[in-house]
């Protein structure tokens, strides 16, 4: 009975997708700022 809780997986997946979304926005912001300041 020590298996992963099925109700926990969608939350982890949502948190991971949110983390990658924020990381992608951060990288795009850095690229755009370096492009505009050059």
UniProtKB/Swiss-Prot annotation:
Subcellular location: Plastid, Chloroplast thylakoid membrane
Membrane topology: Single-pass membrane protein
Membrane-spanning parts: 17-37
Keyword annotations: Chloroplast, Membrane, Photosynthesis, Photosystem II, Plastid, Reaction center, Thylakoid, Transmembrane, Transmembrane helix
Record-level GO cellular component terms: chloroplast thylakoid membrane; photosystem II reaction center
Pfam family, one: PsbL
NCBIfam families: PRK00753.1
Function: One of the components of the core complex of photosystem II (PSII). PSII is a light-driven water:plastoquinone oxidoreductase that uses light energy to abstract electrons from H(2)O, generating O(2) and a proton gradient subsequently used for ATP formation. It consists of a core antenna complex that captures photons, and an electron transfer chain that converts photonic excitation into a charge separation. This subunit is found at the monomer-monomer interface and is required for correct PSII assembly and/or dimerization.
Protein name per UniProt: Photosystem II reaction center protein L
Organism phylogeny: Eukaryota, Rhodophyta, Bangiophyceae, Bangiales, Bangiaceae
Underlying gene: psbL
């Amino acid at each position: 009975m020590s298996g992963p809780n099925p109700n926990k997986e969608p939350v982890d997946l949502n948190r991971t997708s949110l983390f990658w979304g924020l990381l992608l926005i951060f990288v795009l912001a850095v690229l755009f700022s370096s492009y505009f300041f050059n």
